[in-house]
């Protein structure tokens, strides 16, 4: 298959699935060659899907029932608060959430970094995750604990220092096989491709693949692109006005501790720019999870959950599980 990639020929879903499994047994130099050739050619939806399905199939097994995930690819180079973590905690007030996450790669506040800064502990195994979701509606699935098969590939990725298909795979490889998903991508060109790949992996009923003018979140200060999948695909542009919100600037964030503090400020009812940023994305997540029928309703119930103290109480439950 390496020759095929070098000749810039696309792989099928089945070939991509097979290639992922081959890479687990390959030498480091051949892993690097495959990943570089695939990246140089340009990755397709079938290739992303084949890799993602194989990654799920090689993951530690976990069954949490019907869950939602709020996960982004990261890699947008922005210094923002960790919005997806905030959204996942709000969402857990209404439905089961299995948040697939990792430490920071490019941002100042990866989801696992912020999760720990909030005072929550990393769950060690599927049994602990099941207890957490039963007690709180929330489980944080720390990616390295569920994808041990990747131990050989990860050092090669680090050594290469280029983007590879693995920069896209994280949100598509949740071992809990989420039925609902809001998935951030770091480039608008990826939204349709990743939505298509997610549909091919299977198991998802409804998903929003989002990009906020370069952010892997919806942008509170301009237009964002969404590709919605619910058995069929629809791509459209939205602005904060569609959520009943005013345009607000994004305040940079310098550390996981700062991100955690600012999330708690919002959960405590503080009215500021971060609140709008979080409400916009929470409204979309509630819509993606089929809890509400439109974005406006999603924002309203997210507001009510925050202002009633429900979200702060949910965070305390998660910390004490």
Curated annotation (Swiss-Prot):
Annotated Gene Ontology cellular component terms: cytosol
Annotated coiled-coil segments of the chain: none
List of residues binding Mg(2+) 2: 216-217
Cofactors required: Mg(2+)
Record pathway: Amino-acid biosynthesis; L-tryptophan biosynthesis; L-tryptophan from chorismate: step 2/5
UniProt entry tagged with the keyword Amino-acid biosynthesis: yes
Binding site for anthranilate 2: 157
Positions annotated to bind anthranilate 1: 72, 102
InterPro entries to which the protein is assigned, alphabetical: Anthranilate_Pribosyl_Tfrase, Glycosyl_Trfase_fam3, Glycosyl_Trfase_fam3_N_dom, Glycosyl_Trfase_fam3_N_dom_sf, Nuc_phospho_transferase
Reactions performed catalytically: N-(5-phospho-beta-D-ribosyl)anthranilate + diphosphate = 5-phospho-alpha-D-ribose 1-diphosphate + anthranilate
Keyword Magnesium: yes
PANTHER family per UniProt: ANTHRANILATE PHOSPHORIBOSYLTRANSFERASE
Family, per entry: Belongs to the anthranilate phosphoribosyltransferase family.
Role, per record: Catalyzes the transfer of the phosphoribosyl group of 5-phosphorylribose-1-pyrophosphate (PRPP) to anthranilate to yield N-(5'-phosphoribosyl)-anthranilate (PRA).
This protein's name: Anthranilate phosphoribosyltransferase
Species of origin: Methanococcus vannielii (strain ATCC 35089 / DSM 1224 / JCM 13029 / OCM 148 / SB)
Gene name for this UniProt entry: trpD
């Amino acid at each position: 298959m390496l020759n095929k990639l070098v000749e810039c020929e696309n792989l099928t879903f089945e070939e991509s699935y097979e290639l992922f499994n081959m890479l687990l047994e390959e030498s480091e130099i051949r892993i690097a060659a495959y990943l570089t050739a695939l990246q140089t050619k340009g990755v397709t939806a079938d290739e992303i899907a084949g890799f993602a399905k194989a990654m799920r199939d090689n993951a530690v097994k976990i069954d949490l029932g019907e869950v939602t995930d709020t996960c982004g690819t990261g890699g947008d180079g922005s210094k923002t608060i960790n919005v997806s973590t905030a959204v996942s905690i709000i969402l857990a007030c209404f439905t089961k959430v299995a948040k697939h996450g990792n430490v920071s790669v490019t941002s100042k506040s990866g989801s696992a970094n912020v999760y720990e800064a909030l005072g929550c502990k990393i769950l060690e195994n599927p049994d602990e995750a099941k207890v957490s979701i039963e007690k709180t509606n929330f489980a944080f699935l720390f990616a390295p604990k569920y994808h041990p098969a990747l131990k050989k590939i990860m050092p090669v990725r680090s050594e290469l220092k280029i983007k590879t298909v693995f920069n896209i795979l994280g949100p598509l490889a949740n071992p809990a096989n989420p039925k609902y998903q809001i998935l951030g991508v770091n480039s608008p060109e990826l939204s349709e491709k990743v939505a298509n790949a997610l549909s091919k992996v299977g198991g998802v009923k409804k998903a929003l693949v989002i990009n906020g003018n370069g952010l892997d979140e919806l942008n509170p200060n301009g237009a964002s692109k969404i590709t919605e999948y619910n058995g069929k695909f629809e791509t459209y542009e939205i602005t904060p006005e569609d959520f009943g919100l005013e345009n607000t600037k994004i305040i940079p964030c310098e550390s996981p501790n700062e991100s955690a503090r600012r999330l708690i400020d919002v959960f405590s009812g503080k009215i500021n720019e971060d609140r709008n940023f979080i409400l916009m994305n929470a409204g979309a997540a509630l819509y993606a999870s089929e809890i509400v029928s439109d974005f406006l309703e999603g924002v309203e119930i997210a507001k009510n959950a925050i202002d009633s103290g429900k979200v702060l109480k949910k965070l305390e439950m998660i910390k004490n599980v």
